[in-house]
Design a protein with these regions (language model features):
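Short, surface-exposed linear motifs at loops/turns and structural transition points
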Residues: 26-147
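Bacterial N-terminal signal peptides that target proteins for export
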Residues: 1-9
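C-terminal segment of classical bacterial N-terminal signal peptides
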Residues: 16-24
Length: 147
């Protein structure tokens, strides 16, 4: 009987180790959703190079699920923002505001892009805010790259 109990204990401990996830202990609690999410700073270009640009903005803390995404819809036609870039962020329930940063890759040098920004929960629920259409132009191709 003691051997059976020992085997059961070892098996249970092994299964527990194999199926445990240390991230479960780090998940922030869900917080009340903000009545209205507003962009309070930006959006603005944090960095722009030939092939990539990072767009940053700050909103009040949207609340809800701790896992969110900053979302940028962009394109070369202000009436057809057909491309989307997203970047994950974990909300801090103790902060009144949230800074979103989204990286746009594979851009064309010397090209004007138009964009809007917003945010959503990880499961896809939109936070209900969207910026006006803004624009930026990527730097032209460098001399070094042309050689």
């Amino acid at each position: 009987m003691n051997t059976l109990l020992l085997k059961l204990t070892i098996t249970t401990a092994g299964i527990s180790l194999l199926t445990s996830n240390p991230m479960h202990g780090q998940v922030s609690p869900t917080t009340p959703k903000a009545a209205r999410v507003q962009i309070i700073k930006g959006p603005e270009i944090e960095m722009s190079k030939e092939l990539l640009t990072i767009i940053r903005w700050t909103s009040n803390n949207p609340g809800g699920s701790p896992e969110h995404y900053g979302v940028v819809h962009y394109g070369t036609d202000p009436n057809n923002l057909s491309q989307t870039a997203k970047s994950p962020i974990r909300l801090n329930p103790d902060h009144a505001s949230t800074v979103f940063r989204v990286r746009l890759d594979n851009l064309k040098p010397g090209t004007t892009y138009y964009y809007t920004v917003g945010s959503m929960e990880a499961q896809g629920t939109d936070d209900g805010t969207k910026s006006v259409v803004k624009q930026f132009t990527t730097p032209a191709e460098s001399q070094r790259a042309r050689r």
